[in-house]
């Protein structure tokens, strides 16, 4: 979020990515958009993303917000909803998967307006790897319309596949950047893997 509470597309405010911008110097939206990322990439705001999604109807995204505090989550998603409303593009939330990191975050976000697609990612809250813990989280997802869960690839066990299938909730893992590992995970019951490489599935 910018200094004025507007949502832009950046992982965090660490220094060195954009001139004059750091955790100690959080920019306005205009200042952010005026400073190339790593001296070569074009910065984008959430509004820019919406306009891009309108132009290209095959784009779908997973949100990757970095806050779990209820007040900040509320401010962030309210700003996103307001941007979409002002542009007349609220329907584009149908092509977004809202990533949540805990049951509390889900309830905070869902209170603002139920989104069509959610995914529950475990890394922020932690996951002890037991089958019982997985069942509890998948039960929460099923009861609340959350379509999938994501965990670190090294936490996945083939024994989870039956649990996931019985719950009707899909399981995903991150981050996998080699084909053999990805194929093995998919064969063991994972629905999909997160990767940095678009061509991971190609021959």
Place the predicted regions along the sequence by residue.
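C-terminal active-site rim and adjoining tail of enzyme catalytic domains
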Residues: 120-203
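Metal-dependent phosphodiesterase/phospholipase catalytic core, i.e.
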Residues: 3-6, 11-117, 147, 151
């Amino acid at each position: 979020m910018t200094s004025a509470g507007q949502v832009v597309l950046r992982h965090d405010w660490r220094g060195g990515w954009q001139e004059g911008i750091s955790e100690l110097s959080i920019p306005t939206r205009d200042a952010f958009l005026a400073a190339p990322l790593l001296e070569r990439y074009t910065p984008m705001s959430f509004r820019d993303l919406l306009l891009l999604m309108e132009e290209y109807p095959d784009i779908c995204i997973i949100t990757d917000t970095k806050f779990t505090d209820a007040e900040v989550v509320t401010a962030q998603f309210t700003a996103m909803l307001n941007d979409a409303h002002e542009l007349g593009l609220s329907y584009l939330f149908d092509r977004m998967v809202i990533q949540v990191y805990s049951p509390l975050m889900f309830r905070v976000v869902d209170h603002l307006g139920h989104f069509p697609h959610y995914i529950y990612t475990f890394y922020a809250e932690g996951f002890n790897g037991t089958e019982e813990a997985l069942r509890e989280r998948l039960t929460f997802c099923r009861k609340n319309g959350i379509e999938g869960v994501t965990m670190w690839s090294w936490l996945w066990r083939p024994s989870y596949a039956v649990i996931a299938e019985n719950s009707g909730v899909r399981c995903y893992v991150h981050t996998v950047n080699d084909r053999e590992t990805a194929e093995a995970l998919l064969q063991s019951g994972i629905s999909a893997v997160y990767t940095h490489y678009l061509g991971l599935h190609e021959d």
